[in-house]
Amino acid sequence: MYGKSPTRAVLFLLGLQLTALWPTAAVEIYTPRVLEAVNGTDVRLKCTFSSFAPVGDALTVTWNFRPRDGGPEQFVFYYHVDPFKPMSGRFKDRVAWDGNPERYDVSILLWKLQFDDNGTYTCQVKNPPDVDGLIGEIQLSVVQTVRFSEIHFLALAIGSACALMVIIVIVVVLFQHFRKKRRAERAHRVVEIKSKEEEKLNQEKKASVSLEYTD
C-alpha cells in the first residue's frame, strides 16, 4: 500500500506538468472592425472563426447589439444546430442566417437598415472544448450615402486614366486619318493642276502649229 503512494504522487505531478504545458484551447474570431452601409439597404455582417476542435453539434453562435447612443445590449441572433431568429424587438424579421459552420463562417444578414442600427455588433463562437477567446466586434455606421474610400478613389483614378488613354488614342488615330486625307486631297489637286496645265500647253501648241500652216 505504501509502496504505491510515491508512484501515484509522481504520476499526479507529471499530469499537472503536462496540463500546464498543454496550450489553452481558444476560438479565434475574425470580423471587419468597421463597416459602412446605406440606409434602407441590406448588409452582411461577416464573422469567421478558427478552432482546434472539430466543428460539431456543440457549436453555438451568439450575435448581440450595443446601440451607439447607449442603452442595454440587445439580442440579434443565435445558432445551435439550427438558426434561431429573434421573435420580438427591433431585429424581428430583419435578420437571417448566412453562415456555413463547416467553412468556419457564422455570418448573418441584416435587412432594411435604419439609422438607429448604428452601433456595435458582437459575434461570439463557442466550439467545445474550445470555449474561450475574444468576442468579435463590428462597428456599423448607417449613412445616407457611402463615402468614397481609398479603394474607391483608386478605382476612380484608374478608370479615369484608362478613359483618358482611350480618348488620346482616338484623337491620335483621327488626327492621322484626317492628315492622310488632306495629303491625298492636296496630291489629287496637284495632279489636276498639272493635267490642266499640260492640256493648256497642248492646246497652245496645236494652235501655234495651225497658225504656221495657215501662214
Swiss-Prot record:
Positions of disulphide bridges: C47-C123
Bilayer-spanning residue ranges: 155-175
Location, primary (coarse class): membrane
Ranges facing Cytoplasmic side: 176-215
Membrane topology of this protein: Single-pass type I membrane protein
Record domain Ig-like V-type: where: 27-141
UniProt record, GO biological process: cell-cell adhesion
Keyword Signal: yes
SUPFAM superfamilies: Immunoglobulin
Extracellular side: 27-154
UniProt-listed InterPro entries: Ig-like_dom, Ig-like_dom_sf, Ig-like_fold, Ig_sub, Ig_V-set, MPZL2_Ig-like_dom, Myelin_P0-rel
Cellular localisation: Membrane
Pfam families the record matches: V-set (PF07686)
This protein's UniProt keywords: Cell adhesion, Disulfide bond, Glycoprotein, Immunoglobulin domain, Membrane, Signal, Transmembrane, Transmembrane helix
Positions annotated with a glycan in the UniProt record: N39, N118
Signal peptide: 1-26
GO cellular component, one term: plasma membrane
Similarity comment text for this entry: Belongs to the myelin P0 protein family.
Function description: Mediates homophilic cell-cell adhesion.
Protein's recorded name: Myelin protein zero-like protein 2
Taxonomic path: Eukaryota, Metazoa, Chordata, Craniata, Vertebrata
